[in-house]
Swiss-Prot record:
UniProt cross-references to CDD domains, sorted A to Z: S14_ClpP_2
Catalytic-site annotation from UniProt: S101 (nucleophile), H126
Organism annotation: Piper cenocladum (Ant piper)
Main location per the UniProt record: plastid
Gene name linked to the record: clpP
PANTHER family (UniProt xref): ATP-DEPENDENT CLP PROTEASE PROTEOLYTIC SUBUNIT (PTHR10381), CHLOROPLASTIC ATP-DEPENDENT CLP PROTEASE PROTEOLYTIC SUBUNIT 1 (PTHR10381:SF15)
Pfam families given in the database record: CLP_protease
Keywords: Chloroplast, Hydrolase, Plastid, Protease, Serine protease
Listed name of the protein: ATP-dependent Clp protease proteolytic subunit
EC number: 3.4.21.92
Function: Cleaves peptides in various proteins in a process that requires ATP hydrolysis. Has a chymotrypsin-like activity. Plays a major role in the degradation of misfolded proteins.
Length: 202
């Protein structure tokens, strides 16, 4: 039986009684954001909206984006990445579980020195895939041209933010490359691997 989103007590400043709000609402007030699903337009718009709102509310306090995502659509993922570069606060990215495909692209987009993976997390990178498997030839050619542009964009970002040479990134994007947390750190996708029992999110 589904229980819905858990609720937790929250007391607004100046109020005596606490109100019950859903746990994500409470965490958002602490500037903690979550990408825990496939990247699509809906979740992208939610995260972009939250980042912009929290940046306007207080541009000096950092944001924390927790990622456990199998990837998803490229353009919505790029929208999240671009917003992370646009907003005033630094955006910490934290990989928990899996950051694959566009999940890893968003992970690498965090503020350099503030990208972290949990010790048993996994990261996977690869090139963008086509959605036209049985399309007419003309549509497939147009799709291939757009995919090439997107691949160049993703490659350029990975090169810039990992410090790896172009040829290394290009070769990695040719196939699915899975990395442990420490391998992702060596690859420049994250800067730190969390130590167990050292977290403090209060």
């Amino acid at each position: 039986m589904p229980i819905g989103v858990p609720k937790v007590p929250f007391r607004s400043p100046g109020e005596e009684d606490a109100a019950w709000v859903d746990v994500y609402n409470r965490l958002h007030r602490e500037r903690l954001l979550f990408l825990g699903q496939e990247v699509d337009s809906e979740i992208s718009n939610q995260i972009v909206g939250l980042m912009v709102y929290l940046s306007i509310e207080d541009g000096t306090r950092d944001l924390y984006l927790f990622i456990n995502s199998p990837g998803g659509w490229v353009i919505p993922g790029i929208a999240i990445y671009d917003t992370m570069q646009f907003v005033s606060p630094d955006v910490h990215t934290i990989c928990m579980g899996l950051a694959a495909s566009m999940g890893s692209f968003i992970l690498v987009g965090g503020e350099i020195t503030k990208r972290l993976a949990f010790p048993h997390a996994w990261v996977m990178i690869h090139q963008p895939a086509s959605s036209f498997y049985e399309a007419p030839t003309g549509e497939f050619i147009l799709e291939a041209e757009e995919l090439l542009k997107l691949r160049e964009t993703l490659t350029r970002v990975y090169v810039q933010r990992t410090g790896n040479p172009l040829w290394v990134v290009s070769e990695d994007l040719e196939r699915d490359v899975f990395m442990s947390a420490t391998e992702a750190q060596a690859h420049g996708i994250v800067d730190l691997v969390a130590v167990e029992n050292s977290g403090n999110f209060t």
